[in-house]
Regions:
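Short, surface-exposed coil-to-beta transition loops
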Residues: 80-81, 96, 109-115, 128
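A short hydrophobic beta-strand element
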Residues: 90-99
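A solvent-exposed, acidic/Ser-Thr-rich amphipathic alpha-helical stretch
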Residues: 35-85, 90
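Short, low-complexity N-terminal intrinsically disordered segments enriched in polar/charged residues
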Residues: 2-42, 62
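Short beta-strand edge/turn micro-motifs at domain boundaries
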Residues: 112-135
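Residue-level signal for well-ordered, solvent-exposed loop/turn and beta-edge residues enriched
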Residues: 45, 107, 123-125
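Short beta-strand segments enriched in hydrophobic/aromatic residues
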Residues: 40, 99-101, 131
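Short, cysteine-centered beta-strand-loop-beta hairpins and adjacent loop/turn segments enriched
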Residues: 101-110
């Protein structure tokens, strides 16, 4: 995966470091939902990059967030987030990446994107995703 260095920042008496975000990215690339959710707080929020809401579709709580992530893997069985770069500052974090995947209908997607994070008690409390919208034939 991409180069990253440890950056330690205090957060609610817990350390959140860049390696934590890399571990989260690795779990996504492994499609390991249990490992993904171990990085999230019980009251986590996921704001998807698209949807009917102003900030994209919003999922609240571990069960809804888990189901939303599982749907990504169903929609893109080969989903991959490459070339990650992670940053942490206090109770906020940022990851940028290149998403590649093939929808079940054969549509290929390759786009840049990013996640904005809020941390609480050493875990991700909010994952707000943004990505370009470009489809390849």
């Amino acid at each position: 995966m991409g180069r990253h260095r440890k950056i330690y920042k205090k957060n609610n008496s817990m350390d959140v470091i860049v390696d934590f975000l890399q571990s989260f990215a690795d779990a996504f690339n492994a499609h390991n939902i249990k490992a993904i959710m171990s990085h999230m707080t019980d009251d986590c929020v996921f704001e998807a990059s698209a949807g009917p809401d102003f900030n994209g579709e919003k999922f609240t709580g571990k069960q809804q967030v888990k189901e939303a992530f599982e749907k990504v893997f169903e929609t893109f069985p080969d989903a991959h987030w490459g070339n990650p770069r992670h940053f942490v500052s206090g109770d906020r974090g940022f990851s940028e990446w290149i998403f590649t995947g093939t929808k079940t209908d054969g549509t290929k997607v390759e786009v840049t994107g990013c996640d904005l994070f809020a941390f609480k008690d050493g875990k991700i409390s909010v994952k707000n995703s943004y990505r370009k919208n470009r489809f390849l034939k």
